[in-house]
Amino acid sequence: MSAALRFDNIGKVFPGVRALDGISFDVHAGEVHGLMGENGAGKSTLLKILGGEYQPDAGSVLVDGRPVQFANAAASIAAGIAVIHQELQYVPDLTVAENLLLGRLPNAFGWVKKREAKRYVRERLAEMGVDLDPDARLGRLSIAQRQMVEICKALMRNARVIALDEPTSSLSHRETEVLFKLVDDLRAQGRALIYISHRMDEIYRLCDACTIFRDGRKIASHDALADVPRERLVAEMVGREIADIYHYAPRTLGDVRFSAEGVDGPALREPASFSVRAGEIVGFFGLVGAGRSELMRLVYGADRRRAGALTLDGKRIDVKRTGDAIRHGIVLCPEDRKEEGIIAIASVAENINISCRRHSLRAGLFINGKTESETADRFIQRLKIKTPNRRQKIRFLSGGNQQKAILSRWLAEPDLKVVILDEPTRGIDVGAKHEIYDVIYRLAERGCAIVMVSSELPEVLGVSDRIVVMREGRIAGELPRADANEHAVLNLALPQTSAVEAA
């Protein structure tokens, strides 16, 4: 039986980097084919070739046994292919309905039939079990809701081949289950699916087969994934055994370094209070919509507080905007690193040196290009940032390497006291996670107070000294590491009316 989709000896080269080297594998109708590998292994590059964004330098793509060449994304869509990238593609000022039907809006004599469009979208969303308001503007939705819109857009095009790149990275448990049901239904309909994820549970739950990438090459393909041990997949991905990804070690903690008392804002149901000691890692866990990120933005001065007091090393501080927080040695690595964490048009070196430049300019000093280059090279080597050189634009790096560059920025900060990390390993492979945890521990050993917001419960349990749990806009409780386990944390995180159902 011929494959619904075949990659035959695909090669792709960028300046200084061989992104793909001789990639070949098949995806069959009625099959979910997992694609795994470290960040920068070439998975997303392959999907961009499939989606018509890039053209291969070698090899060919075959759909139903016929060679195809996609000059652009429109040609790929016309061939019945839908690619849902990790970097979402939408128009923020348009509604859900308008985004879903972009380029296909029903019209008469040049006038869009909005009522007909909304009715059609509402019916299709109901069929897929997705709860979204067709009139809501995309720019006002959460990242999780925007991701569901992208997934629904592909499904509404009735594509025969669907590729999903980290589709659950921002979804809640309930939204993830909706997606899993959609994937199962699509497989039953005979669609061919490619599924990229760093989450082993998802790969084993959804995928029939799996291909492993490393450094742009195919390491292995497994036609019967259920028979392959997880440890083997991890070793194939990273090229080494990782016995304990979290490698937590107890530290001596200092006095309370930072505290927030009675912090309140529009996204919170009640004022929130918490504290962090010097050298302590406090994990914040909660379901999507619990208010964790919103609380951190209030503390950091990114959003206006209605009330609340902040204390640093026993002294009250005034933080009304992000610049105030940074001057006090408080920094935030945001959840949406593409929009808020990196300067996409700048180089890796420039992104790493932002903190150093601020100190130089404040002191009235000239920017020292040689020092900046040495700093960038030191952190590129120290954090194993995969880039052809320091001058590479950071937008061309994988998510994990972008995140390591952001963390390098703050490692270079001499006056750092409080580090807030919002989903620091979202969409990042197991090897890069291991390295990012090293950075977090290094910051804690320097005496920094660390706040880590994460939706991955094993991560929170594995890295944190103490866990604060939020539920529906309020702090539901906290647990010391010794008393924390999945049951105890979820018991605090789940709405009480849904605890039995979710269990």
UniProtKB/Swiss-Prot annotation:
ATP binds at G37, E38, N39, G40, A41, G42, K43, S44. It is an enzyme of class 7 (translocase). Residues 5-240, 251-497 form the ABC transporter domain. It is a peripheral membrane protein. CDD domains: ABC_Carb_Monos_I, ABC_Carb_Monos_II. It is found in: Cell inner membrane. It comes from the Bacteria. The keyword Magnesium does not apply. GO terms for cellular component: plasma membrane. GO terms for molecular function: ABC-type L-arabinose transporter activity; ATP binding; ATP hydrolysis activity. Its EC number is 7.5.2.12. InterPro entries: AAA+_ATPase (IPR003593), ABC_carbohydrate_import_ATPase (IPR050107), ABC_transporter-like_ATP-bd (IPR003439), ABC_transporter-like_CS (IPR017871), P-loop_NTPase (IPR027417). The keyword Translocase applies. Keywords: ATP-binding, Cell inner membrane, Cell membrane, Membrane, Nucleotide-binding, Repeat, Sugar transport, Translocase, Transport. It catalyses: L-arabinose(out) + ATP + H2O = L-arabinose(in) + ADP + phosphate + H(+). PROSITE patterns: ABC_TRANSPORTER_1, ABC_TRANSPORTER_2, ARAG. SMART domains: AAA. The complex is composed of two ATP-binding proteins (AraG), two transmembrane proteins (AraH) and a solute-binding protein (AraF). Belongs to the ABC transporter superfamily. Arabinose importer (TC 3.A.1.2.2) family. Part of the ABC transporter complex AraFGH involved in arabinose import. Responsible for energy coupling to the transport system. This is Arabinose import ATP-binding protein AraG 1. The gene is araG1.
